[in-house]
Amino acid sequence: MDRLGSFSSDPSDKPPCRGCSSYLMEPYIKCAECGPPPFFLCLQCFTRGFEYKKHQSDHTYEIMTSDFPVLDPSWTAQEEMALLEAVMDCGFGNWQDVANQMCTKTKEECEKHYMKHFINNPLFASTLLNLKQAEEAKTADTAIPFHSADDPPRPTFDSLLSRDMAGYMPARADFIEEFDNYAEWDLRDIDFVEDDSDILHALKMAVVDIYHSRLKERQRRKKIIRDHGLINLRKFQLMERRYPKEVQDLYETMRRFARIVGPVEHDKFIESHALEFELRREIKRLQEYRTAGITNFCSARTYDHLKKTREEERLKRTMLSEVLQYIQDSSACQQWLRRQADIDSGLSPSVPMTSNSGRRSAPPLNLTGLPGTEKLNEKEKELCQMVRLVPGAYLEYKSALLNECNKQGGLRLAQARALIKIDVNKTRKIYDFLIREGYITKA
């Protein structure tokens, strides 16, 4: 509504021109780059390119006018304000004097328009915001549903996850034990009295200064932990694992400098190097295509398919060396053959590889007392027991896969493995379980 300027018909109510100091008459110009205060010019000063201090003649500008309809197509904004001012001056019902003061409308038009828009239906159907927009903007009267927050997690006191979080209490946003927790002990016996000597007084003040420096260090460490999101360590580690191995090594090296550059700058630095790594890998792939004489992506897809086929053939030729490892154990050899048959038929290996000399398969994980168990259903508990995965880690992996699936509209196994980066067999079982239960969909 800035372009309305002043609706008043009195020129003295409008701001003066900065060029000639005359009263502004619509339309006039407002500089869009200067201000505050706003920089107004009349048309004459604007056309001759008036400049003053920081204002230049090539600045962008706005045309200030009230010559447009607001409530009725046949009434301009200037006439609306003139009608209201005339009613205030002449009184309600004195429509002849109102029309004489306006000069542009008859008394019948003034009465009809005023009664319609300001008495019978004031500012509802005729305002700039229609009823539909007003209904959408209306605040709902229903209760706001409550959703428990899991970030940061709220483990039970003295649980394993609580110890991993250094005793952090999310409800209080503080720790059970502070850094340098006994810093206050040095002050417990200090008492300032008037008969202290200058040396003793200076010594006590030095102890207080040391205590203040220890408090500053405590707050500095808290700020670093909060700014960098180190409260939920497992979530932090999960985010770190989404990078390739080379970027993870850089992440580990540069972590000690994160407190210096700040969280945003540190994340930008890591993301830029991750992008650089992706670009280098893509350049290397394109160089491989060019070395092989490939100049278009259609041929590149054929090349990748044939290369993958050659790799599979090479792996099959090395199976003999694997068989030789179990040649002395007939039972293990039969298990290996059945496992390879399942793989060739596209099934997951149903027989785990064991040998008389090897270790036994691990028993199912006991979930009793582990944090997060109460958030799992029976099928999820069974999955965590079989793959020996703690509930907290499973919930983080599940959340990461769900977010990625919603973002991409589907998820492939290769994407899941690149995202959570744990044992590939465990990843496959988690991925198959989430697909089977309908949590995610295949891409």
From Swiss-Prot:
List locations, semicolon-separated.
Answer: Nucleus; Chromosome
- List the GO biological process terms: chromatin remodeling; mitotic cell cycle; regulation of cell cycle; regulation of cell division; regulation of embryonic development; regulation of protein stability; regulation of transcription by RNA polymerase II
According to the record, the residues making up region (Disordered) are 347-372
Q: What is this protein called?
A: Transcriptional adapter 2-alpha
Q: Which residues form the SWIRM domain?
A: 356-443
Give me the Gene Ontology terms describing cellular component.
ATAC complex; mitotic spindle; nucleus; SAGA-type complex
**What are the start-end ranges of the zinc fingers (ZZ-type)?**
12-69
Residues recorded as bearing Phosphoserine in the entry: S6
This protein's assembly is summarised as: Interacts with GCN5 and NR3C1. Associated with the P/CAF protein in the PCAF complex. Component of the PCAF complex, at least composed of TADA2L/ADA2, TADA3L/ADA3, TAF5L/PAF65-beta, TAF6L/PAF65-alpha, TAF10/TAFII30, TAF12/TAFII20, TAF9/TAFII31 and TRRAP. Component of the ADA2A-containing complex (ATAC), composed of KAT14, KAT2A, TADA2L, TADA3L, ZZ3, MBIP, WDR5, YEATS2, CCDC101 and DR1. Interacts with CCDC134.
Report the transmembrane regions from the record: none
Tell me which domain of life the UniProt entry assigns to the organism this sequence originates from: Eukaryota
Q: Where does Zn(2+) 2 bind?
A: C31, C34, H55, H59
Q: Which InterPro entries match?
A: ADA2-like_ZZ (IPR041983), Ada2/TADA2 (IPR016827), Homeodomain-like_sf (IPR009057), Myb_dom (IPR017930), SANT/Myb (IPR001005), SANT_dom (IPR017884), SWIRM (IPR007526), TADA2A_B-like_dom (IPR055141)
Q: What is its main location?
A: nucleus
